[in-house]
Amino acid sequence: MTTLRDAVFGQAVGDALGVPYEFRARDSFVCTDMTGRGTHGMPAGTWSDDTSMALALCDSYRELGRVDADDILARFRAWRDEGAYSVDGLFDIGITTSIALDSGRGGAGKRDNGNGSLMRTVPLAFTDATDDEVRAVSAITHAHAIACDACVDCVRAARMLASGASAERAALAVGMGWVATAPRGAIRSGGYVLDTWAAALWCLVRTGSYEECVLAAVNLGEDTDTTAAVAGALAGIVYGASSIPRSWMNALRGKDVTERCLF
């Protein structure tokens, strides 16, 4: 039976794999294993804002037993300001997210459709969140309909995967069936929410294991940690946390922080 743990550890490992390569151009590197330093100079196995914000969401639901956007916002601020839900404190945060945490209002313009809400959304698949509640959680930082609807589709697909649906069927159900036949060159890996969503599904559909999926995600380049975080969360659901290479799990930092937030 698939659990939240499968998704969250799948995400954390994918995130950590991608951190050293963030912002690097596609095909300017090849990721084959867990490594450190790189873009942010962090030790191997360090996850980023993607996983920290997902853990804040998880911890809120664990304590309250319901989806509460105001409480989640407070926990996001605790992460940013106090280093909660992290190993070494904040070292990366998106512009839209940073502005929203200051103002208390999510960005609602077309230019605010980055992947900063999608990256933390998969855990909501393991709650009773309605579509409107998923949108409300996205809107904490990313309030435009494009970002909110992408999060709704992500939760729907994740729930299908957790129920045993194939990656192809889940992608088709959320209007992304085209990724099954798309060439790599058609997949974009920057920070736009729909590009990240398509890239994560493409990696899942076109590979046959957790390891293959997250490596494919990182090697798309650019926003490597977020693409691999979302793809890794979905692959964790499909293949289970037990499928994650042992050496990667051993290298993952902050496992105790992660475990404490699960429900």
Go through each PLM region and give its residues.
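Structured, active/binding-site neighborhoods that engage oxygen-rich ligands
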Residues: 1-263
